[in-house]
Amino acid sequence: MNIWLSMLTTTGLGAIIGGFTNHLAIKMLFRPHRPIYIGKFQVPFTPGLIPKRRDELAVQLGKMVVEHLLTPEGIGKKLTNEEFQKGLIHWAQVEVDKVITNEQSLRHMLEKWDVAHVEKEATEKIEQVITEKIQSFLEEYYTYTWEQALPHSVHEKIENAIPNVSAFILKRAIHFFESEEGKSRLSKMIDDFFASRGTLLNLVGMFLGNVSVVDRVQPEVIKFLGQDGTKQLLTEVLQKEWEKLKGRDVKEVETFVEKEMIVSSILSAVKVEETVSKFLNQSVQQVCEPVRETIMEKVVPSAVTKGLKWGAENVASILNNLHLAEIVQQEVSTFSTERLEDLVLSITKNELKMITYLGALLGGMIGIVQGLLLLFLK
């Protein structure tokens, strides 16, 4: 009975000592948090291992993250993963669709994004671009003649239109002189002519009798205007003038209209400020609706794919610029010892318990061996 009691005692003591020793060793990894002194003498094993080596631990964790966890190869592989790309494209499409189907005005959206004075700046920028383009255009074309400046198709159209212009002018002239206003104007012209000739009017009056001069002249003028020869004559005159104009410099326009006036007239006609204001007052949905399908089906997938491709090709450079090791080191260095202990224990709690139990088991087994040795020695 004493033998079995001795074995039980040695086994129990061995288990208690083994379990307690392992438990104490685990605790000493974290405790005490600060060094303990007796006078000027620092008690050995204080502070605990992790508090004592926290800075080194932070450095090593940073290296471990960069060299073994967040490696360029691993991240690049993830970025080129087909399933990951599909998921990211779908997410991007959902988020972009929320924006482009928004019923708020474009002006309101820009203000919400803190983009101030966009209307004024856009108007000024557009007017500046238009002004620069017009001035550049005029500077170039002012070095040309009209023949050089106008396209060949315009030359053909003008030359083909001259006979029609002649016919139109003569038609309007006939219509004018057939009217009472035209007859009155013709009469005044005749009176002015004879007034400058003195007695010539009396001499003409003797030949015409009671018929007024204008009644005689009006039909002849209309007849003259309606003749083919008159049309041909006017056409030739217009063609000669057109030939003269083609040889003249475009720059001569500046003697009649200055550059600034041309620019100002075009800007007034374009109404940039009004156009920009109307555009900004439209809802985002109205602006984007014509291109919504293109954005969703082509632009977003293409942008995401190209972005991921670029990221995969430059991931090493990106990680180097991020200095992840330093970030991890700085973050770990800011952890309190208590937080670091809680973090490690939250991950390894079950394993550390098993180590304690293993110590008790080994201690118990050693106790049994000791009991057996004592038994044989007796």
Swiss-Prot record:
Pfam families: DUF445. It is a multi-pass membrane protein. It is found in: Cell membrane. Keywords: Cell membrane, Membrane, Transmembrane, Transmembrane helix. One of its GO terms (cellular component) is plasma membrane. The chain crosses the membrane at residues 1-21, 357-377. It comes from the Bacteria. Coiled coil: none annotated. Its main location: membrane. Belongs to the UPF0754 family. This is UPF0754 membrane protein BCQ_0944. It comes from Bacillus cereus (strain Q1).
